[in-house]
From Swiss-Prot:
Radical SAM core domain boundaries: 152-384
Positions bound to [4Fe-4S] cluster 2: C166, C170, C173
Cofactor: [4Fe-4S] cluster
Pfam families: Radical_SAM (PF04055), TRAM (PF01938), UPF0004 (PF00919)
Taxonomy, superkingdom: Bacteria
Co-factor binding comment: Binds 2 [4Fe-4S] clusters. One cluster is coordinated with 3 cysteines and an exchangeable S-adenosyl-L-methionine.
Function in brief: Catalyzes the methylthiolation of N6-(dimethylallyl)adenosine (i(6)A), leading to the formation of 2-methylthio-N6-(dimethylallyl)adenosine (ms(2)i(6)A) at position 37 in tRNAs that read codons beginning with uridine.
Subunit structure, interactors included: Monomer.
Catalytic activity: N(6)-dimethylallyladenosine(37) in tRNA + (sulfur carrier)-SH + AH2 + 2 S-adenosyl-L-methionine = 2-methylsulfanyl-N(6)-dimethylallyladenosine(37) in tRNA + (sulfur carrier)-H + 5'-deoxyadenosine + L-methionine + A + S-adenosyl-L-homocysteine + 2 H(+)
Catalytic activity, EC: 2.8.4.3
Protein's UniProt name: tRNA-2-methylthio-N(6)-dimethylallyladenosine synthase
GO cellular component: cytosol
Length: 468
């Protein structure tokens, strides 16, 4: 029997890329590949790229330069290393990658990685393989199921893609061009995946999609199901104790999703709901198709049915034409909502997007100053939210042993890491997969520290009360 070939994947960007990287491993496992943490002994290296941030492609080319040296070293040792560029940079700039970096064997877009075995064989024969077309048939029907040992090795939490692509065409965003139009998987296919994951130890699911709450997959009744209805069904799968979803668009929050948050204890009271700006003028320029007031009303709908719910968001500062008044409107919105955390970025033009051609680019120094001010407010809110847990008892789903001997690590409903030393005689590994009450004693940066409690947890105070 031939020895296994070693595969190293370096993944950038979003949760979808994390999921895609795992599925690439599943695709290549029948071909005899096993994962390795090191590039140096890899027979195959895959860069699973992201195109969202500025200079994404240049970072890829820089990494490819380093990989070319590793490939040369492998060749001197008598080994052949193949190099693959996958993901959204591959989709957007495949021809440029082929032109600039001859060391690359395969360039494959995010809708075609189920063809990796064929593409690798083609590259071995002809020297190069490129596939970045959007296929007629979606890839999910062709992906092999992960092996039980792979599921267990990935832990008790898992991502499941239910929707892919986006039809919103925000003027700053490349996703519609790199991931394509919105496609939703059938309910039956998702349910089969989830039941298999649960059978092999998964306890927490995060349903993912570029615009996940636009989900409209075919249901067993022959009608399209909403995300809320899908969540209701998945909450009934034995073994699944927590459900999450990401990333959402405010315009696609419907009655079914609100009802799911009202009715399902398994659906965590923590929602990532990007808004990008608090200025109606900038929101219109971004083609977001909602106002700041619309966004606040969506937040209010969630809080009306789940008072303990918390939110995170995304913000862009320095969008073309953003004035001081526009930025102050963003600060005002952040203060009004009160977030458990948020991600803030300086605007970076993405080639091929409408915003990249807009006039009135904001000076870099102004963007830097605005980003710092916004991040200070966000950090203060996150600190206040975390401090509010001190002295309280919260539910923690334990995931793995901690870095310190005898320590166990899990996460709260709000994704806060929680570090606990179980009582003497209780093995930390025995707690993995269990939800147990933890009394929070203190904080360490963004983590909660505490001890197992005998009393059941209380609901956290609604986040609106902790806004900075």
């Amino acid at each position: 029997m031939a020895p296994p070939r070693k595969l190293h994947i370096k993944s950038y960007g979003c949760q979808m890329n994390v999921y895609d990287a795992q599925r690439m491993v599943d695709v290549l496992a029948p071909e005899g590949f096993v994962e390795t943490a090191s590039v140096d002994d890899a027979d195959l290296v895959i860069l699973n790229t992201c195109h969202i941030r500025e200079k994404a492609s240049e970072k890829v080319f820089s990494e490819l330069g380093r990989l070319r040296l590793a490939r040369d070293e492998a060749s001197r040792d008598g080994r052949r290393m193949q190099i693959v560029v996958a993901g959204c940079v591959a989709q957007a700039e495949g021809d440029e990658i082929v032109r600039r970096q001859p060391a690359v064997d395969v360039v494959v877009g995010p809708q075609s990685y189920h063809h990796l075995p064929r593409l690798l064989a083609q590259a071995a024969q002809t020297g190069r393989a490129l596939e970045t077309e959007f296929p007629i048939a979606d890839k999910f029907g062709f992906l092999p199921q992960p092996q039980p040992e792979a599921i267990r090795a990935r832990g008790i939490s898992a991502f499941v893609t239910v929707q892919e692509g986006c039809d919103k065409f925000c003027t700053f965003c490349v996703v519609p061009y790199t991931r394509g139009a919105e496609v939703s998987r059938p309910v039956a296919a998702i349910l089969a995946d989830v039941e298999r994951l649960a059978d092999h130890g998964v306890r927490e699911l995060t349903l993912i999609g570029q615009n996940v709450n636009a989900y409209h997959g075919d249901g067993p009744d022959g009608r399209p199901w909403t995300l809320g209805r899908l969540l209701q069904r998945l909450a009934a799968v034995p073994g699944i104790v927590r459900l999450r979803y990401s990333t959402s668009h405010p315009n696609d929050v419907d009655d079914d999703l609100i009802a799911a948050h009202r009715d399902l204890d398994a659906l965590m009271p923590f929602v990532h709901l990007p808004v990008q700006s608090g200025s109606d003028r900038i929101l219109a320029a971004m083609n977001r198709k909602h106002t700041a007031a619309d966004y606040r009303r969506v937040i209010d709908r969630f809080r009306a049915v789940r008072p303990e719910i918390a939110f995170s968001s995304d913000f862009i500062v320095g969008f073309p034409g953003e004035t001081d008044a526009d930025f102050e409107a963003t600060l005002a919105l952040v203060t009004q909502i009160g977030y458990a955390g948020a991600y803030s970025f300086k605007y970076s033009p993405r080639p091929g997007t409408p915003a990249a051609e807009m006039p009135e680019m904001v000076p870099a120094a102004v963007m830097d100053e605005r980003l710092e001010r916004l991040q200070q407010v966000i950090d203060a809110q996150q600190s206040a939210f975390n401090r509010a847990a001190i002295g309280r008892t919260v539910d923690v789903l334990f995931e793995r042993a901690g870095r310190k001997p005898g320590q166990i690590v899990g996460r709260t409903a709000y994704l806060q890491p929680a570090h606990v030393f179980p009582p003497a005689g209780m093995a930390p590994d025995s707690l993995v997969g269990q939800i147990l009450p933890v009394r929070v004693d203190s904080l360490e940066r963004y983590s909660l520290l505490g001890e197992l409690a005998a009393t059941p947890p209380r609901h956290a105070r609604p986040l609106a009360a902790t806004g900075a």
